[in-house]
């Protein structure tokens, strides 16, 4: 079942925009941000090494983002600077469960956007929209070694529910990594947590 999220979500400094319809120009813009940030992103995101040219991001736009929006499997948004509209990164509400009214948020930022609070603002904007539409629980998973990524749910008031030990294979370092599970409930969001 589809979750009824808006095509745009605005906050003070960022705007989250549905990346559809997919265009090659948009794919090139996303690819350039990934390519500029490749060294940092590949440390944490397994898909980065498979992104070698703009066509790879176009495939994601068509077969991933657009298809997921249509089927309700996921809701990817481009994170843009509200004033300049420059691309900062991507945030995604995924693994939506109609039965449990839950979903997971995943995200990445380009290197030039890190350290300015953009992702914290984007997460808060997306969680606001999702909780208003009836979601009860949002989860964020972070690699325990990725301190910057783990700081985002911490700043957004998510509760660290636990650590999944050796739960994900890290192909860059050739080892299993631990993953933190962070969560926020609608009741906590309503209290302003």
Question: Model-derived features: where do they sit?
Answer:
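Acyl-donor (CoA/ACP) binding surface of acyl/acetyltransferases
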Residues: 1-29, 33-40, 76-193
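Generic, well-ordered alpha-helical segments
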Residues: 33, 53-57, 71
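Conserved GNAT-fold acetyl-CoA-binding loop/helix
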Residues: 39-63
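Sparse recognition of residues in long alpha-helices and their boundaries
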Residues: 46, 57, 73-74, 169
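A short helix-loop-beta-strand connector motif used in the catalytic cores of GNAT acetyltransferases and
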Residues: 50-51, 62-77
């Amino acid at each position: 079942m589809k979750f009824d999220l808006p095509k745009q979500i605005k906050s003070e400094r960022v705007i989250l925009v549905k990346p559809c319809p997919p265009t090659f120009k948009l794919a090139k813009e996303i690819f350039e941000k990934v390519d500029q940030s490749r060294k940092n992103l590949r440390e944490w995101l397994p898909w980065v090494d498979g992104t070698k040219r703009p066509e790879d991001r176009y495939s994601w736009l068509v077969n991933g983002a657009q298809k997921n929006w249509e089927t309700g499997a996921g809701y990817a948004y481009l994170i843009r600077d509200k004033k300049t509209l420059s691309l900062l990164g991507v945030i995604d509400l995924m693994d939506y469960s109609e039965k449990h009214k839950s979903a997971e948020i995943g995200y990445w930022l380009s290197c030039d956007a890190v350290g300015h609070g953009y992702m914290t603002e984007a997460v808060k904007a997306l969680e606001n929209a999702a909780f208003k539409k009836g979601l009860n629980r949002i989860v964020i998973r972070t690699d325990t070694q990725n301190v910057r990524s783990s700081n985002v749910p911490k700043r957004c008031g998510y509760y660290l529910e636990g650590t999944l030990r050796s739960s994900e294979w890290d192909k860059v370092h050739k080892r299993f990594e631990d993953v933190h599970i962070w969560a926020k409930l609608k009741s906590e969001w309503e209290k302003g947590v």
